Amino acid sequence: MSRIFSSALQAVFKPSAFLPKTATRSFSILPSLRPATLSSTPSTIFRAPNAITAPSASPSATTGIDGEVLDLLSASSLISSHPALSGLGSQIRCGPRPTMSGATRLVQKRRHGFLSRVKTKNGQKTLKRRLAKGRLRLSA
């Protein structure tokens, strides 16, 4: 009796018994948070009312060959129109920053000096390359 009962329990509690027979993937029908250039009815779900305004563009530049509206915006306008970054849009910089412009000589030595090159693996490679090239100054 216990053997029959245990085999029945094993059949019921198989991992495949809990999984669905077909693997289906469900997609969300929530509105996209990505701003579109030409939207007839902008969705206000999950967005602040002041963050909806997208930069206006000419229709000829935003329509494709088939006449559909393209979702094309520059990177700077995407960042500034993002709801989470609406207050910080003017402060975000997407390029190289002048990190050594106001740095002192001490900071320069700490970042690019000989001891910092010796401590790291890539720094040692840099010193070897400069030594092989014949540089008199191996570091800053």
Swiss-Prot record:
Entry keyword Ribosomal protein: yes
A GO CC annotation given for this chain: mitochondrial large ribosomal subunit
Superkingdom per UniProt: Eukaryota
One GO process term, biological-process aspect: translation
Gene3D superfamilies associated with the record: 1.10.287.3980
Subcellular compartments: Mitochondrion
Entry keyword annotation includes Ribosomal protein: yes
GO MF annotation terms: structural constituent of ribosome
Main subcellular location of this protein, as a coarse class: mitochondrion
Keyword annotations from UniProtKB, A to Z: Mitochondrion, Ribonucleoprotein, Ribosomal protein
Oligomer and partners: Component of the mitochondrial large ribosomal subunit (mt-LSU). Mature N.crassa 74S mitochondrial ribosomes consist of a small (37S) and a large (54S) subunit. The 37S small subunit contains a 16S ribosomal RNA (16S mt-rRNA) and 32 different proteins. The 54S large subunit contains a 23S rRNA (23S mt-rRNA) and 42 different proteins.
Record function comment: Component of the mitochondrial ribosome (mitoribosome), a dedicated translation machinery responsible for the synthesis of mitochondrial genome-encoded proteins, including at least some of the essential transmembrane subunits of the mitochondrial respiratory chain. The mitoribosomes are attached to the mitochondrial inner membrane and translation products are cotranslationally integrated into the membrane.
Family: Belongs to the bacterial ribosomal protein bL34 family.
Protein name from the UniProt record: Large ribosomal subunit protein bL34m
